[in-house]
Amino acid sequence: MKNKVLFALIIPLLSCSLIGCSKQDERVLLTYGTEIQQNLVTLKEVNNDELYDKAFNEKEVFLLAVYQGGYSEDCLCWSTYQDVIVNYMNSNHELVYVYDAQKQDDSLKDLKITKYEDSAPSLYIFKGQEQITSFTYKKSQDKAIFEDRKGEAMKERVHKYANKPLLYYVSPEFVLDNKSTHHKSIAVLYVRRGCGDCKYVLPNVVIPYINSNNNVNPIYIVDLQDLYDLQNKGETSGMPYDAIKNRLELTESSNKTFGYRGGVVPTIQYYEKGVLSDASVFFNDEVSQKEDGSYYISDSFYSEERLTSIKYAKYIDNNVLKGMDINKEDVITTATGYTYWSQEKAAKYHAPLFQSFIEYYCSFILPANNS
């Protein structure tokens, strides 16, 4: 795939020539960044459950800015550091979560986040539940991190331990502007943060692939949850959820080849110079029962009709799922009678296809040595 044999020969030779076969970069790879402009209102404060999920379940690599509850409310050092965080995120496009240490419960004790009985802010770098390092306003050598409003001191210290992420949150408008104006070649992953399939695909498929491959271009993520919630509440301000799915060509009615049904998540698209040229849909298969009681996939993005158009699928043996028989024990039926393919079993077929898409469109080719 894309001359992988040649890549395998080039990579070690090139890396040795560029860095003299020095010690491998041991910095961690931050998981998420953002291209969405931030301000004090948009800073993401996580609660105990959210922090536990990021550290223990999703094994995310992240930056955590910590304040001390009521001790910090009227403190200039914390209000200054909030400005630092905003400027840092807007300049470096790296997500920073905010957390109140005074609300910490026993479930998070292994993170070793310090509670102070004063206003001193802190900054932590976590790789899952492992604390990579921490900085505190209490240490004179760390104070610049919390006082340099431009975020340059924070950048210098953070990047000694962490590399920039490869997954960046963007707005739907970012994608639409690229289609109409900028015409860049980009990969875009559509999710909803409340979607179970999306919670599965990122930590179990996308992130492990990125962490094990150092030749991946950035992937942009659009979280459609807010638009989905507004539509369900009957609020019509702005562009409705269904309308944005059509404009993004997620629906089959807007793009017969690369759209699927009414538009589903998780879906990843590839835009070649602003034009949608391929896509991959994770899960979202329809399961039906035959007259003899057996089950099969009655609808899937991976059909015979699409096979000639989805270029990455030819590298995967099981690339047509529509019409495939599945075992009865692999089917889950809800209390309302809805049937679906279990995540564990479906992932054996969907994960290779999704990762093949990433490898085909997001891996970059090392430049040839023409000297």
Regions found by a protein language model. Name each.
Residues 1-5:
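Positively charged n-region of N-terminal signal peptides that target proteins for export
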Residues 16-20:
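C-terminal motif of bacterial Sec signal peptides marking the signal peptidase cleavage site
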Residues 22-24:
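Bacterial signal peptide processing site
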Residues 38, 47-94, 174-222:
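Local sequence-structure signature of Cys/Sec-based thiol-disulfide redox active-site neighborhoods
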Residues 45, 67, 93-108, 190, ...:
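Thiol-based oxidoreductase modules, predominantly thioredoxin-like and allied folds used
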Residues 121-122, 192-200, 264-269:
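C-type cytochrome heme c attachment motif
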Residues 124-163, 258-370:
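Non-catalytic, surface beta->alpha helical segment in thiol-disulfide oxidoreductase systems
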Residues 239-261, 271-273:
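Short, internal strand/loop/helix patches
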